[in-house]
Curated annotation (Swiss-Prot):
Active site: 240
Gene: rihA
Protein's name in the database: Pyrimidine-specific ribonucleoside hydrolase RihA
Annotated PROSITE patterns: IUNH
Enzyme Commission number(s): 3.2.-.-
GO cellular component: cytosol
């Protein structure tokens, strides 16, 4: 039985690869793709989702744009990481279809309402759309099986010393999500910084004879540029967002611990910090399954095997 999911993203190189990974597996049933501002401006992230789905010949998946800015803060984007388009590197096709007339929150609500099974939400950008959905559609909480998100860190941040980018962009939204009572899987920097793609992995991907693998290799060529800065101490480039999909497909690849996680929304120094209580020091009940470790080679093999699925026959099956 396939698991119904909604991908809420801000493409973004690693968002695009997460989307490509998800759509290679029939055990995941994407009901919709929604977008928010984050890695680039809202018009560009929406266009990028349409471009990736056009590449995959999946115009059957409804797409809607969502929040153009955080709940109560000014928009911040990561164009220094993802380039002018948000997906710099490959020559992607122009969109072959249009987004839905409704916004992201209403499309998510409609798909959750219509689903005969609980739906898993997979946000890989700022959590604004998810927070708005939870705040405006309390009647649907019971139909959300889990929120599998990329965001946060138990250790150091990547946008400030204390905060990871997605949470820092809209900490108030993250606070709503983590207080919702809905089961959460948190794929934070602790695990995603271990999910590094190396030069030799990119060459494995480039050798796969299909246009989707070629696109991913070229996305990774560009993504590598930012992460070669010696300050990070990386050998490769961390594939943050695909960890969410990899966990859904094979949770055995990961080491995890149930923890209480709180969001800092006030401090000047630590705004956007995810406070992860690994040692039950607060006495608060756990609200998230936090990923701390990954079988990196197993993760890379999953990605490579998934990209090999996208033969011309597979892409033209619809």
């Amino acid at each position: 039985m396939s698991r119904p999911i909604i991908l809420d993203c801000d493409p973004g190189h690693d968002d695009a690869i997460a989307l490509i990974l998800a759509l290679a597996h029939p055990e995941l049933n994407p009901l919709a793709v929604t977008t928010s501002a984050g890695n680039q401006t809202p018009d560009k992230t929406l266009n990028n989702a349409l471009r990736i789905l056009t590449l995959l010949n999946r115009s059957d998946i409804p797409v809607a744009g969502g929040a153009v800015k955080p709940l109560s803060r000014e928009l911040m984007i990561a164009d220094n990481v993802h380039g002018e388009t948000g997906l710099d590197g490959p020559a992607l096709p122009a969109p072959s279809f249009q987004p839905q007339a409704v916004n992201a929150v209403e499309l998510m609500a409609e798909k959750i309402r219509q689903s005969d099974k609980p739906v898993t939400l997979v946000p890989t950008g700022p959590l604004t759309n998810i927070a708005l959905l939870l705040a405006s559609h309390g009647e649907l909480h019971a139909k959300i099986e889990r929120i599998v998100l990329m965001g946060g860190a138990a250790g150091v941040g990547n946008w400030t010393p204390a905060a990871e980018f997605n949470i820092f962009v809209d900490p108030e939204a993250a606070d709503i999500v983590f207080k919702s009572g809905i089961p959460i899987t948190m794929c934070g920097l602790d695990v995603t910084h271990q999910a590094q793609i190396m030069d030799e992995d990119i060459e494995r991907i480039r050798a796969i004879p299909n246009p989707v693998a070629k696109c991913v290799a070229e996305l990774l060529d560009f993504f590598m540029i930012y992460h070669r800065d010696p300050k990070w101490g990386f050998v490769g480039a961390p594939l943050h967002d695909p960890c969410t999909i990899a966990w859904l497909l094979n949770p055995a690849l990961f080491d995890a611990q149930d923890c209480w996680v709180g969001i800092e929304t006030q401090s000047e120094l630590t705004l956007g910090m995810t406070v992860v209580d690994r040692y039950q020091l607060t006495g608060k009940p756990t609200n998230a399954t936090v990923l701390f470790g990954i079988d990196r080679q197993g993760f890379v093999d999953l990605l490579v095997d998934s990209l090999a699925v996208y033969t011309p026959t597979y892409l033209n099956r619809r």
